[in-house]
């Protein structure tokens, strides 16, 4: 509690400075960035801009997704992670409306986007730092009048069985169509979902398969799917992830499934993974100091 008070006090002082304060920046530069960004409760009064990469950056001028809209509800509001670049907020408006219009759901339940100014989070994600990552619950949004309290208690629904090798009986054509709509959007760079879902979509898709390229298998991601948007036009300080390899990616997803069902033996000579050092403010793009300093 004392540490959090000191962090917040430093941030208040930093934001109150009308000019760049190099001494304070030096003192804060060695602090874990998650404590600096995790202590801020609102977005910066700046022109919207993502700075850095999805797992090492921040976002200026983020918008807050309304807690409830005509076709969505933001979940787990206590986390204060319903902030994103305006492109991400517009994407949610569009995709949730399409889900309601074409998939028979009332809309979408939206999980984590970013903190008010992005940056590393106190708990959970390594990415979601520049306001362009969106978690969308697999649970059908059948009730868009959930109270704040209910949204803290309710959980999404897992779609996997056999540790993610296959979808379970709760998987539906609607899930396929909503993920297809998200992947078909030109703003989308990637979608992460558990391997069994990707393989199932590969089997079920009978039409255009180009969108499958953006759907990539990844661990977890069975209670939600994760949409990653490309850097917006003109965002010169934003770093895109390398695009997926050409093709529909179905063979790669099948390899993931084989490895789940028949795990390869561990390599006794594999080097031990060194734990990653925590991200400090000094390791983030220099623009992130200004994002913290802004009103």
Predicted stretch roles:
Residues 21-26, 146, 150-295:
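Catalytic cores and adjacent binding grooves of peptidoglycan-active enzymes
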Residues 103-105, 129-133, 222-224:
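Extracytoplasmic
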Residues 123-141:
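Short, surface-exposed glycine/acidic/tryptophan-bearing loops
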Residues 20-51:
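Solvent-exposed N-terminal domain segments of exported/luminal and surface proteins
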């Amino acid at each position: 509690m004392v540490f959090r008070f000191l962090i917040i006090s430093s941030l208040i002082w930093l934001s109150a400075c009308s000019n760049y304060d190099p001494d304070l920046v030096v003192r804060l530069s060695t602090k874990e960035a998650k404590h600096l960004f995790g202590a801020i409760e609102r977005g910066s009064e700046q022109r919207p801009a993502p700075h850095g990469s999805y797992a090492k950056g921040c976002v200026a001028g983020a918008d807050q997704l309304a807690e409830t809209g005509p076709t969505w509800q933001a979940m787990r509001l206590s986390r204060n992670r319903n902030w994103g670049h305006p492109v991400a907020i517009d994407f949610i408006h569009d995709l949730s409306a399409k889900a309601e219009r074409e998939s028979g759901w009332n809309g979408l339940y939206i999980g984590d986007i970013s903190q008010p100014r992005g940056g590393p989070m106190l708990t959970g994600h390594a990415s979601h730092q520049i306001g362009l990552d969106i978690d969308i619950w697999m649970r059908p949004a059948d009730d868009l009048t959930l109270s704040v309290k209910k949204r803290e208690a309710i959980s999404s629904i897992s779609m996997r069985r056999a540790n993610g090798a296959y979808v379970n009986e709760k998987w539906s054509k609607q899930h396929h169509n909503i993920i297809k709509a998200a992947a078909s959007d030109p703003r989308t760079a990637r979608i992460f979902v558990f391997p069994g879902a990707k393989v199932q979509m590969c089997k079920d898709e009978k039409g255009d398969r180009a969108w499958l390229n953006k759907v990539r298998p990844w661990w977890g991601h069975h209670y939600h799917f994760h949409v990653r948007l490309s850097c917006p036009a003109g965002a010169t300080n934003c770093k895109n992830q390398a695009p997926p390899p050409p093709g529909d990616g179905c063979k790669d997803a099948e390899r993931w499934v084989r490895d789940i069902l028949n795990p390869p033996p561990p390599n006794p000579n594999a080097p031990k993974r060194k734990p990653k050092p925590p991200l400090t403010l000094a390791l983030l793009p220099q623009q992130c100091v200004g994002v913290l300093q802004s009103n």
